[in-house]
């Protein structure tokens, strides 16, 4: 007799926008979707099998963009802008991982309305696996502004 155990994988992020003087001008707390490819990546890492993209397959990059489409089956942001940034990950409890990333001045190179963010295992947009994605109402990021993102992935 086999037994099936279901562990939900959920995500939540906090986005803080700072102006050029370091003053907090916006803060958002947003739930997100852990996409199918992200769940499959977790499965493959546990099994030690599957095709793992990236140097080690570790989720360690964040990206921002503009777009509202996509969902559970998404594998990329709708319109990624700027350069992906390194996301430092650390265990925060027995079942959660915290990622920290920051999009500083000139990333992207001009003022942009940001409406989506993603968590990936590679620095380039054309390869790799997306773990999680979220959309939100527009954050108008000025060229000199910084977006600081704290992303929590919880299993179980």
Model-derived features with residue positions:
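Small cysteine-rich, disulfide-bonded extracellular modules of the LU/uPAR three-finger superfamily
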Residues: 1-115, 122-156
């Amino acid at each position: 007799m086999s037994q099936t155990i279901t562990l939900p994988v959920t995500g939540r992020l906090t986005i803080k926008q700072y102006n050029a003087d370091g003053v907090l001008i916006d803060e958002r707390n947003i739930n997100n979707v852990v996409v199918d490819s992200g769940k499959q990546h977790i499965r493959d890492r546990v099994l030690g099998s599957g095709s793992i993209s990236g140097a080690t397959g570790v989720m360690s990059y964040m990206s921002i963009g503009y777009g509202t489409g996509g969902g559970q089956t998404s594998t990329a942001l709708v319109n990624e802008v700027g350069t992906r940034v390194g996301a430092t990950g650390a265990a925060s409890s027995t079942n959660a991982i915290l990622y920290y990333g920051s999009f500083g001045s000139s990333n992207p190179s001009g003022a942009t309305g940001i409406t989506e963010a993603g968590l990936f295992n590679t620095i380039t947009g054309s390869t790799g696996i997306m773990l999680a994605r979220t959309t939100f109402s527009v954050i108008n990021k000025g060229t000199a502004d910084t977006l600081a993102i704290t992303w929590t992935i919880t299993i179980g």
